Amino acid sequence: MLRLGIVGLPNVGKSTLFNALTSSKAAAAENYPFCTVEPNVGVVEVPDPRLARLFELVRPKRKVPAVVEFVDIAGLVRGASQGEGLGNQFLSHIREVDAIVNVIRCFEDPDVVHVMGPVDPVRDHDVITSELALADLGVVERRLEKTRKTARAGDKEAQLEVVVLERVLAELNAGRGAREAGETDDAIRFLRQLGLLTAKPILYAANVNEDDLAAGGGKWLDRLRAAVQSHHEEAEIVPFSAKFEAELAELAGEERGEYLASAGVREPGLDRLIHAGYHLLGLQTFFTVGENEVRAWTMHRGGTAFAAAGEIHSDFQRGFIRAETVAYEEFVRVGSYKAAREQGLVRSEGRDYVVQDGDVLLFRFNV
């Protein structure tokens, strides 16, 4: 399951965003710093109209969407890397997620205090970036000291790791992230073991005023974009209004659509955030259909039928024979597996077949 950690300074809208994502009141959204002490965890459905269409056609007993796990982590402050505020708890929780959603305040409201004074998304961006880098710096320095001793004794694996760690250390000292150290197989392997924060993919959720939604943001969002670009970050920025999303979460059906239209937006910011997370991590969806259920599954783009089988159950991999495959568009056009077979649209693919986004798969296996 994809795990995204929601981070940011106190009072930027993290917990309000989390509440809207999970359509719950699990996260305390009071207007004071550190209202989220322990991380709140919520499982959110991945919005995908294709699953609803398959459900209409097949009419099984149930519909099972793909899901994303969001973790609302306590607000970070300057000095967290040295344990200030809730720094140590924050840093331990964030190391466990697949990617980071950095919520940046891009709105002004005198009733919502900012822990650092006036609204300044560039300053907030820099604080978060530097604290994560400082935390990683300590981890890398300690690991490098230990690994150098092993490398001097002639250990080839340790010698490779020293090269990677020295490159990472140089990037961190230059104010950049570990992700800038390259994407060689060795770098990926060693960095994964360390769980470095700045090696994790990141996207920005820019919390803007509701009035700025239709225009795609305002002056504060423009400044955040400039800051991200100046750091040469290839990170997507998703504008949203936590207040608007919280109100939208209370509505359903036509009321929901009307409320979106009134704000001049076509899609909830939360949906865009989830889709951005998928894109960031290189994920895609495939489907299985049957009398009991239609289900959406998540896998990495470029993954094989064998890998997809493992997403369902290890037995599917162990006894893999073939994957009977039909493209989503073809399945919807003819309406069923039976019709797809009759029209020669079902392909018998082996374990090395590269699954395409939206493929409808039926696995044949024997254990």
Annotate the PLM regions:
Residues 78, 128, 296-297:
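Conserved short-loop catalytic and cofactor-binding motifs
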Residues 2-7, 12, 18, 146-356, ...:
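C-terminal-of-GTPase-core extension/linker across diverse P-loop GTPases
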Residues 1-113, 122, 131, 141-142, ...:
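Conserved G1/Walker A P-loop phosphate-binding module
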Residues 87-193, 204:
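Long, charged N-terminal accessory/stalk domains
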Residues 24, 50-51, 74-77, 105-111, ...:
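Conserved nucleotide-binding/hydrolysis micro-motifs of P-loop NTPases
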Residues 21, 83-86, 115-118, 218-221, ...:
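Short, glycine/charged-enriched secondary-structure capping and boundary segments
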